Regions:
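Class I S-adenosyl-L-methionine
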Residues: 1-103, 107-108, 126-132
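Short, contiguous strand/loop micro-motifs
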Residues: 8-9, 119-121, 143-144
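A short alpha->loop->secondary-structure connector
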Residues: 90-96, 115-119, 162-168
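Short, well-ordered alpha-helices that flank and scaffold nucleotide-derived cofactor binding pockets
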Residues: 86, 90, 111, 158, ...
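A contiguous loop/helix-start segment that scaffolds small-molecule binding in enzyme catalytic cores
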Residues: 2-6, 19-22, 69-71, 139-172
Length: 172
């Protein structure tokens, strides 16, 4: 049985896709992931397994597909940074996974800003309650929040301002 390739595909277009990720995708018989990650491979002739419905059902199907061919699960950014990898670890042993890191959105952000990220607190508000933002804020360092369509920059800013946090510079 082949290991499940967990492939970080970067923050967006293929120009951030690392060579090791390209190799894993090319060598896979089955590509799994969110619809936007699978879209570029629609005409590839590979079997596509979209993440639809419940996550547990998807992971069950992913486990079954591993017995029928080489599977690559495509995840945004770096799978080692706020991703599905944690949940996969509850289903598969580490030796059953081949994790291929990717470029994360925060790396691209800091590169574009031309600054280092050492010392920056990081937290995800993706699919999480806004109250989680309060756990990560510190006076002595910056905080980077990963956001989603519900917890947008303006929503988070208003939430923090309503709780008495002073105005701060924000990069969105």
């Amino acid at each position: 049985m082949d290991r499940l390739a967990v492939v970080g595909v970067g923050p967006g277009p293929g120009n951030y896709l690392l060579p090791a990720a390209r190799e894993a995708i090319a060598g896979a018989d089955i590509l799994a992931g969110g619809p936007r990650h699978l879209e570029p491979y629609r005409e590839s002739g590979k079997e596509l397994l979209p993440l639809e419905g419940s996550l547990d059902t998807f992971l069950d199907r992913l486990g079954e597909k591993r017995h029928t061919g080489r599977v690559a699960l495509l995840l945004s950014g770096d799978p080692c940074f706020f991703s599905l990898l944690g949940k996969l670890g509850t289903r598969f042993a580490p030796e059953e996974l081949e994790v291929i890191p990717g470029v994360s959105s925060f790396q691209v952000l800091f590169a574009r800003l031309g600054i280092q990220w050492n010392g920056t607190e990081t937290a995800s508000l993706h699919g999480r309650p806004l109250e989680d933002a309060l756990k990560s804020l510190r006076e002595d360092r910056g905080t980077l929040f990963l956001l989603d369509r519900k917890n947008t920059g303006p929503v988070v800013a208003a939430f923090l301002k309503d709780r008495g946090f002073p105005d701060r510079v924000a990069v969105l």
